[in-house]
Amino acid sequence: LCCPPQXCGPDCASPCC
């Protein structure tokens, strides 16, 4: 999982931006 402030990208399970 990758959400702000971590930001989003290909390493994220879902586009939470």
Curated annotation (Swiss-Prot):
Location in the cell reads: Secreted
Which family does this protein fall into?
Answer: Belongs to the conotoxin M superfamily.
Main site of residence? secreted
**Recorded GO MF terms:** toxin activity
> Domains: what does the record tell us?
The cysteine framework is III (CC-C-C-CC).
Q: Which UniProt keywords apply?
A: Disulfide bond, Hydroxylation, Secreted, Toxin
Please describe the organ and tissue distribution of this protein's expression.
Expressed by the venom duct.
- Its recorded name reads Conotoxin Reg12b
Instruction: Output the lineage of the source organism.
Output: Eukaryota, Metazoa, Spiralia, Lophotrochozoa, Mollusca
GO cellular component labels: extracellular region
Keyword Secreted on this protein?
yes
Name which cysteines form disulfide bonds: 2-16, 3-17, 8-12
Q: Which residues get modified to 4-hydroxyproline?
A: 4-5, 10, 15
